[in-house]
Amino acid sequence: MTYTPDTPTVVLVHGGFADASFWVPVIRELQASNLPVLAPANPLRGLAHDAEYVASVVGQIDGPVLLVGHSYGGAVISVAGAAAANVVGLVYVAAFALDEGESFAEIFERFGATPLVDAVRPSSYPVEGGGTAVELSIAPELYQSAFAADLPSEVTEVLAVSQRPFAAIFDDRAQAAAWKTLPSTG
């Protein structure tokens, strides 16, 4: 494939309990096809903050952008896609696509708990100005069964001990739902 100015840059947004290296196989495929790709580090500090960060990354890209989100990254691209004028579409990969005003707590209440909920472990971290806040990670021994059952154990053993925790986001409400106005698939 030949890159043209109209070819969207594919921006891959990882979810919680992971980092941008999650996308390595996809990045390799896109690069092999000569497609522009970027996989920024999702800060995992809260839905509004993370979406604002991703929108700022996207806003610095010349030309159109196709946002791709996995898991929690889907919620992030839904909000970020509404804030960045150059986003031309959204792709959800086993991802959350929250409606405007919807929270993760409502999703889990509506559809029930998953093994992931029982595998999550809270811990506290210091915040600017003093005090602490809660962040979540998956118990390493439960990582594969609760979060990545479709991946080989040699991969999940590394992911389990290198996962990035994220701030408690269950009550965060989506400020936008770009999937309502942009072409979307998943």
Task: Cite the ranges covered by each PLM segment.
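Active-site signature of alpha/beta-hydrolase-fold catalytic machinery across serine-
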Residues: 25, 79-80
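Active-site catalytic motif of lipid deacylating hydrolases and related acyltransferases
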Residues: 3-63
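Glycine-rich His-Gly loop
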Residues: 13-16, 70-71, 95
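Flexible "cap/lid" loop of the alpha/beta hydrolase fold
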Residues: 86-130, 166-171, 175
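Conserved serine/cysteine hydrolase catalytic core
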Residues: 153-186
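Gly/Ala-rich beta-loop-alpha elbow adjacent to hydrolase catalytic centers
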Residues: 68-73, 77
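Helix-loop "lid/cap" segments that line or gate small-molecule binding pockets
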Residues: 129-134, 138-150
